[in-house]
């Protein structure tokens, strides 16, 4: 009897690999999002900013910090996908998990992933934002590992976890928005008979999950980016950063929303499509019940 490949299970590291592959595709959009969020006055549109980066530093400047982006996915996404998928497999499989259980599991996985991924996230934000700084203020990290070493040497080990609370809070919401909503939407489409477990279903589920995740995380994403890119002593803490952002008006919390969605939507779609293809091609059959 031929194996039903749609029943295959993913391996714990597939999420990190899929996230890193997606990051390589969407990094320019992530860079634009970060630079828009760190503007103090919000003078440049996404088109103007793109043109400025191209004129000043060339086309390759859109890939500044790509090594840090890949490092972040290999730590952050490997952890959250690994925990979510591994624990989900240990739960009773006789019926689908209720959504609240998926959300709780995704929140826990996101918290772990956010903490583990903070150093890579910090280097990622700094490298992406470097090109907009004056020459004398640029950090000029050669690559992600150089950034980690220099931060530890020049600013201390704990500096690598600057903004960890914000990053972890965002990761919780992001993982709930992405993993649990993706799972639920995909399950609903398939179980209702509207769709099959195929590429079209993966696309529809992932783009819906990306929209939910963007709305949930954008305010925290803006504050996280500001705190990670801040000079020493610029913000006393999360509340200080919140008050600073609030002074810019309600939309200050949604700076860069369009590029954030434009980046997160394709990144989420690619991540889940890569993940599902890895599962179908290289996953393993579920154990047979005795």
UniProtKB/Swiss-Prot annotation:
Function (record text): Catalyzes the electroneutral exchange or flux of physiologically important metabolites such as dicarboxylates (malonate, malate, succinate), inorganic sulfur-containing anions, and phosphate, across mitochondrial inner membrane. Plays an important role in gluconeogenesis, fatty acid metabolism, urea synthesis, and sulfur metabolism, by supplying the substrates for the different metabolic processes.
Principal location: mitochondrion
Transmembrane stretches, start-end: 12-32, 65-84, 103-123, 163-182, 203-223, 256-276
A single BP term in Gene Ontology: sulfate transmembrane transport
Organism for this UniProt entry: Caenorhabditis elegans
Pfam families for this protein: Mito_carr (PF00153)
Coiled coil ranges: none
One of the record's GO molecular function terms: sulfate transmembrane transporter activity
Membrane topology of this protein: Multi-pass membrane protein
GO CC annotation: mitochondrial inner membrane
Assigned protein family: Belongs to the mitochondrial carrier (TC 2.A.29) family.
Key words, A-Z: Acetylation, Antiport, Lipid transport, Membrane, Mitochondrion, Mitochondrion inner membrane, Repeat, Transmembrane, Transmembrane helix, Transport
SUPFAM superfamilies xrefs: Mitochondrial carrier
Renumbered ranges of Solcar repeats: 6-90, 101-188, 197-281
Catalysed reactions, as listed in the record: (S)-malate(in) + phosphate(out) = (S)-malate(out) + phosphate(in); malonate(out) + (S)-malate(in) = malonate(in) + (S)-malate(out); (S)-malate(in) + succinate(out) = (S)-malate(out) + succinate(in); (S)-malate(in) + sulfate(out) = (S)-malate(out) + sulfate(in)
The keyword rRNA-binding is assigned to this record: no
Modified positions (N6-acetyllysine) in chain numbering: 159
Protein name: Mitochondrial dicarboxylate carrier
Subcellular location(s) per record: Mitochondrion inner membrane
PANTHER family: MITOCHONDRIAL DICARBOXYLATE CARRIER-RELATED
């Amino acid at each position: 009897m031929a194996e039903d490949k749609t029943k295959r299970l993913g391996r714990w590291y597939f999420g990190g690999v899929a996230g890193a592959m997606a990051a390589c595709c969407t990094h320019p959009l992530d860079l634009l999002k970060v630079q828009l969020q760190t503007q103090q006055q919000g003078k440049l549109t996404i088109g103007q900013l793109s043109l400025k980066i191209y004129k000043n530093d060339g086309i390759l400047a859109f890939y500044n910090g790509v090594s840090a982006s890949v490092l972040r996915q290999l730590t952050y996404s490997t952890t959250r996908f690994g925990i979510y998928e591994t624990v989900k497999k240990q739960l009773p499989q006789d019926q689908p998990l209720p959504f609240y259980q998926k959300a709780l599991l995704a929140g826990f996985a996101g918290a772990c992933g956010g903490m583990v991924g903070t150093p890579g996230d910090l280097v990622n934000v700094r490298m992406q934002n470097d090109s907009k700084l004056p020459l004398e203020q640029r950090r000029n990290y050669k690559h992600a590992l150089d950034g980690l070493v220099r931060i530890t040497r020049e600013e201390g080990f704990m500096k690598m976890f600057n903004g960890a609370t914000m990053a972890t809070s965002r990761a919780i919401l992001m993982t709930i928005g992405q993993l649990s909503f993706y799972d639920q939407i995909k399950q609903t489409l398939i179980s209702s008979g509207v769709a099959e477990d195929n590429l079209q279903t993966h696309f529809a589920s992932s783009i819906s999950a990306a929209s939910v995740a963007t709305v949930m995380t954008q305010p925290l994403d803006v504050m996280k980016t500001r705190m990670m890119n801040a000079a020493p002593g610029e913000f006393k803490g999360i509340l200080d950063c919140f008050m600073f952002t609030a002074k810019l008006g309600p939309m200050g919390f949604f700076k860069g929303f369009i590029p954030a969605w434009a980046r997160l939507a394709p990144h989420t779609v690619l991540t889940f499509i890569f993940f599902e293809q890895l599962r179908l091609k290289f996953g393993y059959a579920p154990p047979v019940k005795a």
